[in-house]
Amino acid sequence: MEYLWIIPFSPLIAFIIIGLFGYKFLREPLSGIVAVIGVAISAVASIIGFIDVAKTGNYYDLKLYNWISIGDYNVSVSILWDPLSALMTCVVTCVSTFIFIFATGYMKGDESYPRFFAYLSLFVFMMLMLTLSDNLIQLFFGWEGVGLASYLLIGFWHYKKSAANAAMESFVVNRVGDWLFLLGILLAFVTFGTLDYLQIFNKLAGVDYVIITAIALLLFGGAVGKSAQIPLHIWLPNAMEGPTPVSALIHAATMVAAGVYMVARLMPVFASSEVALDTVMFVGTMSAFIAATMGLVQNDIKRIIAYSTLSQLGYMFAAEGLGLFSEGMFHLTSHAVFKALLFLGSGSVLIALHHLLDVQKMGQIGRAMPITTGTFLIGSLALAGIPPFVGFFSKDPIIEGAYEINTFVFLFLWGGAFLTAFYIFRLFFLTFFDGDRLDPHLREHVHESPPNMTIPLIVLATATVVLGFFKEFFINFLKPSLDPAYMKFLPNDVKALVSEGLSRAHHVHIEPNAFSFLGHSLTSFLGILILATAIAGITLAYVMYQIRRIDPVKIGDMFQPIYKLFYNRWYFDHIYYAIFVYGYYKLSKILWFVGDKVIIDGIVDGSGKGSVFAGGVLGKTQLGRISGYVLQMLIGVVIFLSLFLFLK
């Protein structure tokens, strides 16, 4: 398995080549070709390694070189290759390859074309360092690296004030989560004396419950920021200011899923604390539902999909909190495919409509863009959870599991499923079919995207149709990494501890076979209920936005307080502005007045005024009379004698 080093370093080499020679020798399209080759090589190596693990069930911990020495403890740049990291690596590299190909068409003519592909390659390298790490230090390096690359790519068009502000917001909000994450790493090192995953797992049974809970919650704080969960979610919708391939790669398929992956990677730690699992479950649940309500009333095509990403990440975290780690990771895999498809489809629409974002100004472009329309429909059906598309096989099991484990979680995830189906088909009908709102000049020039943009759409759409039927394979494939009974690297006492933590899901039976699950969903009450909910959401969107039997404006007026709540994103931004921006400004003004004007200026100005006053008083004693001078000398002698006698 020595070839595995190629996986992370191939994109790094592409980044270095483009960074050094891009503007001089590798201008469009050569820099794009170099980037595609770099990530494609990683994808091929990932698939080969994936097949090897699937055949043997083994895991490999490769130490590439010693990186940091802290006393007797050494941190290595490493590659942990097991089913979990192999799956995540394949997701990152394969989806990235098609996004890179799409980007060669999307970014055509951009004056900063080489810089864009250099940043993309840097991001993939950092994401792979995060994914392949066997220790928390390398994980943190990749964690911060993807944050840096995300900042650079969100603000890629930095001459736009909105893009620059969005990049800064993303960077600052993520620092809050990263601060918690770093505290968790430090506490883990103090507790275990190591940051290697396998060594941490081996020592779990001997650590106090409160300490494990604190470590897990601090690490999860980092995941909340990186994966844009409530309350650190506000940066993700504004991150859509970056080019659309960035949204597809970073804010759908890879970086925002890093938090979900981290929780799965450290599953034994989280499973050792019921409080930590409950926190993950409830944060994910509320994020899934609240983000879905926000997506209902947005009109920006990319922001609608962004809110759906935030919501689906909530489903993944809810699954992990429920103890359904394999189902959560399978949903991560399927979501990466169909959400990348939806973002790239929106990018195809934006190119055709000269970057018009408002879906209320679109419509009737379906016939002019048949490939984009058809593939976008497939992605929408997958997101809504309609069989036989992959979203049905990955999302519905989470809702069914919640039904058996926690009623509160089930109700919110079930409600979120209805809202998801509604808002994605609201977007679909408004964009491709409904009405005649499109500007006539734009309508004349609408055409299908070129092959380097449509071929990735077709490939991702095909994967969206096919992938769900491999559900059983993926669930079984992940067992050596996520099922304590199959985790060879865990000692028996830790296996017992982890199994007890996951006991909440022991009584849950979810059909692993895709065809059996489909049959179950079409015959059981719960399966029919969940499927009918998705169909109801699609039907309502059709009635309101296609045939217009219900007026959306009247509905908004009837429920205006709720509409305003959703439209203003539950006022999270307003509250944060009032506290952290306006509040900080007012506090600064108070501190300025008290500290600068009253104290500092008071001392400086007061000493000057005091000197003037004292000089005036003393000046009155200088009258030029001998009697006055004698009196002053007498007073001086008295003071001197008094001090002498006192000190003696």
Regions found by a protein language model. Name each.
Residues 596:
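Alpha-helical polar/charged "hotspots" used for coordination or helix-helix interfaces
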